Amino acid sequence: MTYMKEYYTKIIEALNTISEKEDKEIASAAKSMATAVMNGNSIYLFGASHAGIIAEDAFYRAGGFALFNPIFSPSLMLNVEPVTQTSKLERLEGYGDILLDSKPVKKGDILFIHSVSGRNAVAIDMALTAKERGMGVICLTNLEYSKQVTSRHSSGYRLFELSDTVIDNGGEPGDAVVSIDLLTQKVAPISTIVGSYTIHSIVLKMIEIFEEAGTDIPIFRSANIDGGDDYNSQLFEKYKDQIHYM
């Protein structure tokens, strides 16, 4: 089997696993989010470094849910130089509190955190503070990986230990999945692919709930299709109290 074919096989296995074994957790996450939205609350997404790609993928996206509010920090994104700064800052205790304080979060809101290892301080801080403020916390993490490592937060918690709903991405420790004879480390991570599938699956489950409740479904249209800009502008206006990125 070629390396590329092995990677493809690992991806399909991971997607099948999360679809079959994490369906209840995905449904639980969707129910929490949909309920929050119908109650007038807000949903926030966070991830540091590559984990933050999932928030970017779900946010302001054609065919995507309009009420996802990302929590971005330039110092935790991959366009910062030196890029190693992201690793240092996601381990800095107290930084997650600052980031959450930058948003108008309130009781009943939902915070979705993507962290593969679930060990770093920024995600732990954010989860702890969210819980203190009465928010629901949902995490997407690698349980096998996270259970093998210690927390980098003074509380000793890992992310899955603080979350109301835990979705396991089914990955391997270290995220990469393809073994190479000449290398000591594996190659080709899968968390981004699995994460994208997961967040959009949550949206699809939410839509089923909205359909059953008979409520409107705030989904973006492509801005590159005629009429898309006008339609999206109407969403911004209608849901301005739940949209915090404009």
From Swiss-Prot:
One record GO biological process: carbohydrate derivative metabolic process
Pfam families tied to this protein: SIS_2
Domain SIS, residue spans: 33-212
PROSITE patterns in alphabetical order: SIS
CDD domains (alphabetical): SIS_RpiR
Top-level division of the source organism's lineage: Bacteria
GO molecular function: carbohydrate derivative binding
Family affiliation: Belongs to the UPF0309 family.
Protein name: UPF0309 protein OB3413
